[in-house]
A protein has these predicted regions:
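Extreme N-terminal signal-anchor transmembrane helix of membrane signaling/transducer proteins, especially
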Residues: 1-27, 279-286
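Extracytoplasmic/periplasmic sensory segments of membrane signal-transduction proteins
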Residues: 35-36, 40, 50-129
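Short N-terminal helix-loop-first-beta-strand/juxtamembrane motif that initiates sensory/input modules
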Residues: 57, 82-100, 127, 180-200, ...
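Solvent-exposed, extracytoplasmic
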Residues: 72-87, 116-117, 162, 166-220
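Extracytoplasmic/periplasmic ligand-binding sensor regions of membrane-associated signaling proteins
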Residues: 100-171
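Conserved beta-strands of PAS-like sensory domains
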Residues: 146-184, 201, 240, 254-264
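Extracellular/periplasmic juxtamembrane segments that couple receptor/chemosensory ectodomains to their
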Residues: 213-275
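HAMP signal relay modules and closely related sensory coiled-coil linkers
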Residues: 298-313, 320-349
Length: 361
């Protein structure tokens, strides 16, 4: 009973405390992971946006410098900027009717772009057009191994305070993909999503596919969130949403970033720590029980001898005298008390015997 009671008193609170501790450890580990992924996502978004912003500033400055009434100067400016920055696959200007007046290497000059999104939106305000397949340029450029894909930047051209045309720039999507690739680290995926939740950059099995999971839905609603969820590959991931990719006055492409890490990989160190804790806890529990058992046996031996002696005295006061217990003070006092009780019982027995003998005489 002493052993069982002591074991319950020690192990039950210890188990409850250990379970609370491991739960807090797990929760703290997950929060640290989310924080790390959020920082990674924000840094990736900022780096990508700043790279795009550098190109945008060139386009915006060109919109201020180019005067469509001086096409020679416009061509010189376009040629200079195109040679200076090879990221431009195409750079050109169009009048209000959408006719290209001047362009890099003369590509598309005289062609109408009136129906192209970059032109229509560029007439109204600075614009950024999401990735799309090459259309008019497809026949002007060397045949590639893979179809050309571009993102567009556009801005209004003004003359005497009024819109006189549009400047447009086509950037090869490969440059954006290379920029995204440079943001990747082992074990962590940084995905780029379009406004309609299509994966523009990410794991090969997801590229150009719509992503219909909670984090993608949250990203499309411009909501910052961190969650653990199951992805189409059937695995659980810790996911952080960075809802916008923007910097300063860079026009929005409608992009968002998702940063994910496999839950199994992310929690491996935390689980190892928890496993080590429970192993240590188990070893300590076994050692504690062993010590408790030894202590119980240490207490039990004198108490058993004393109880046996007390039972013997009930039947025969002249039985073997109590063992002189010295293991602990209480046992010693009980032993002395039993010895005195035995002496009194034996004295009473002798007195009764004498009185019985006197009565017979």
């Amino acid at each position: 009973m002493v052993f069982c009671g002591g074991a319950l008193l020690i192990l039950v609170p210890a188990m409850v405390t250990a379970m609370i501790y491991t739960a807090l450890l797990q929760q703290g580990g997950e929060q640290l992971l989310f924080d790390a992924l959020r920082i990674r996502g924000e840094m990736s978004s900022a780096l990508l946006a700043r790279r795009l912003y550098g190109v945008w500033m060139d386009v915006a400055r060109s919109a201020e410098l180019i005067d469509l009434t001086d096409l020679k100067n416009a061509r010189e400016h376009i040629d200079f900027l195109s040679r200076l920055d090879r990221r431009y696959t195409w750079l050109g200007v169009a009048d209000l009717e959408g006719t290209i007046l001047a362009a890099k290497d003369g590509m598309l000059e005289g062609v109408s772009v009136a129906q192209r999104p970059w032109f229509r939106r560029g007439l109204v305000s600075p614009a950024a057009i999401d990735v799309h397949a090459a259309q008019l340029l497809a026949t002007q450029l060397p045949a590639p191994r893979e179809p050309y894909r571009f993102i567009d930047l556009a801005a209004p051209l003004r003359h005497a305070g009024s819109v006189a045309g549009v400047i447009g720039a086509h950037l090869d999507w490969k440059w954006v993909a290379e920029s995204m690739d440079s943001l990747q680290v082992p074990g962590i995926d940084v995905l780029l999503l379009s406004g309609d939740r299509t994966v523009l950059f990410g794991p090969p099995d997801l590229i150009n596919k719509p992503l219909n999971i909670g984090s993608a839905l949250a990203a499309s609603r411009v909501t910052t969130a961190s969650l653990r969820e199951r992805w189409p590959d059937g695995r659980d991931y810790f996911t952080v949403i960075v809802p916008t990719v923007g910097f300063a006055n860079l026009p929005s492409f409608g992009w968002s970033l998702l940063v994910r890490q496999s839950a199994d990989e992310a929690l491996a160190s935390t689980r190892n720590l928890i496993r080590s804790f429970w192993s240590s806890f188990g070893a300590c529990a076994i050692a504690t029980l062993a010590l408790l058992f030894c202590a119980a046996q240490w207490l039990r031996a004198p108490l058993r001898r004393l109880s046996n002696t007390a039972e013997a005295l009930l039947h025969d006061p002249s039985a073997h005298p109590p063992y002189s217990e010295t293991r602990f003070n209480e046992a010693a006092r009980l032993s002395d008390a039993l010895a005195r009780i035995q002496s009194k019982l034996m004295g009473l027995s002798v007195s009764n015997s004498i009185q019985g003998s006197g009565g017979d005489n």
